[in-house]
Every structure is written in structure tokens, then in C-alpha cells.
Amino acid sequence: MALFPDLVPELKAAMPQLRGRLLGNEPLAPLTWFRVGGPAQVLFTPADADDLGYFLAALPRDIDVTVVGVGSNLIVRDGGLPGVVIRLGGRGFGETGTDGDVVSAGSAALDKRVAEAAAAAGLGGLEFYHGIPGTIGGALRMNAGANGRETKDVLIDASAIARDGTLHRLSNAEMGFSYRHSGADPALIFTSARFRGEPMDRAAIRARMDEVQRHRETAQPVREKTGGSTFKNPPGHSAWKLIDAAGCRGLRVGGAQVSEMHCNFLINTGSATAQDIETLGDTVRARVKEHCGIELQWEIKRIGRALD
């Protein structure tokens, strides 16, 4: 049984020139790394940036819009998402390229692929992206970083489309970056970005990337259904150490568990619901607060509504 009224026929009729794909009541769980969550009332996959702009300009303003990438840092709640979920992908948003010391990437390009494109051109400084399991769109939105580097350290500018379909370009300063956060208008949908690399020896760059990958595979539960780092590191502290000290290593709620390998990762052991995972996260936060007085902040984005 469909959770939401079908908006697809109405939208198709209002947008005769649309080239992207519209699907109604489309399951989102297969599109997230946790493999949990309800459906999107409408899932739209635009053909390219022009198609996205056309769609947004024609979309009634009272319909909510949510953007998802590869779903690596995301919990979709079990009741799904009303309105339109936009998923960027394919050739229209996944391309990468280099020109001199500039690396360009579509917002659907995997962070890892951007690091590899830079390395192939002999450009360093972006190796940290090799260990981040997401896309450039997500990296822009949350100032993604690892190994002492962040998106703000390498970004030149980003292109985005507003809710009314207009195109915008934001400089690094206009992005309003802070720790795991961008102050850019939440309604903007990033479509591409440019980064500044540093000319370096290709072998040295590859060695750094290999080290990043080795660290990730030995220290993080990369083979599990997980959303990546769950909580932001509080100033002066490591979230995983606080979680471990509060006795939460291996803690379970339903089919969700705090990873034994890395305490700042929650995993779906196979039968978890989105509610299990979110409840586990909130339980961890409460125990850490009780143990040391520090309130952990979610790094994973949680969207949608609970199942009635």
C-alpha cells in the first residue's frame, strides 16, 4: 500500500519538457548505506543541471524538496519523505576533470573518485577525500574532512541551483564553512565544484591515498551497513573515546548496534529499522552526557518522518 498520494501524473503534465525520471512512492532504503527507511513520495533523478533548473522552476512552491546523494551519511526515517526527493547521478552530475592545478567535479562524483582524478593529474592536497564515503555534494554541504584536512581547505567555488531554478556560484568565503557544516542557504542544490590542487609527485600522492585507505579499512567497519561517523567530535575530544568511556561499545537497540571496531559508528546488523538506529544514537548521547557532561551532536543527517 502506498504511503503517499501519487503526485507523478500531475508533475509530468505540468513539465512537458522534463527529461529526468519521476517515480512515485519509491523505496529509499536501497539508496542508503544503512539500508533502512521509508519511501519518497516522489523520487526525481534529473538528466543534468538544466533539467534540474527546469524542474525546480516549475515545481509548486508548497511541495517540499530534499536532496540525497549516495546515502552514506544519512538515516531516512521509516515513514518516508513527503514531497520530492532529488537524487543527482549519472553523467550529468558525476563527471570529474582537471585543468592546470584546478580539479572540477560534479556534485554526484564520489569523493574517492575526485581524489583519484587529482592524483592522476599529479595534484595533491585532495588525498583526504579518498577515505570519505560520500559525494562532492555532501562534502560541500557538511564541509567533509578527514586526516586533518577539510573541504574548506581546497575549495575554490561551487555552483548551485536555487529553489526557483536560478543558477548561483558561491566562493569559498560565501560557503560559510565551519566544522562539519556549511552556512550556505539550505535550499541551494549543489551541482558542481572546483578545487585547488598542489603539484606533487604522483607516487607520493598515491602513497598517501593508500595510507588513508589502509587506515580506513583497519579502523572502521567498512564491510558493515553503516552511515559513517555518527557524531561530531566535540572540541578537544574524540567522540569514539567518549562513547567507549560511557560503556556503549557493542550496545544494541533492536537490530542496531554500536560497532565493536569503532564506537562512533552505528551498524545495521541485518534487521534494524531506522527507528532502532536513531533510538540507539539518542541512547548513546544520553549515556555520554550522563557520564561526562558532554552532549554529542549528530553528524549523520536524519530526514523524513517516523512511521505512524
From Swiss-Prot:
Native source species: Rhodopseudomonas palustris (strain BisB18)
Protein name as annotated: UDP-N-acetylenolpyruvoylglucosamine reductase
Catalysed reactions, as listed in the record: UDP-N-acetyl-alpha-D-muramate + NADP(+) = UDP-N-acetyl-3-O-(1-carboxyvinyl)-alpha-D-glucosamine + NADPH + H(+)
Gene Ontology cellular-component annotations: cytosol
Functional description taken from the UniProt entry: Cell wall formation.
Entry EC number(s): 1.3.1.98
Domain FAD-binding PCMH-type: 35-200
Cofactor: FAD
Main location class: cytoplasm
UniProt subcellular location: Cytoplasm
Active-site residues, as the UniProt record annotates them: 180, 229 (proton donor), 299
Pfam families in UniProt: FAD_binding_4 (PF01565), MurB_C (PF02873)
Basic and acidic residues bias locations: 211-226
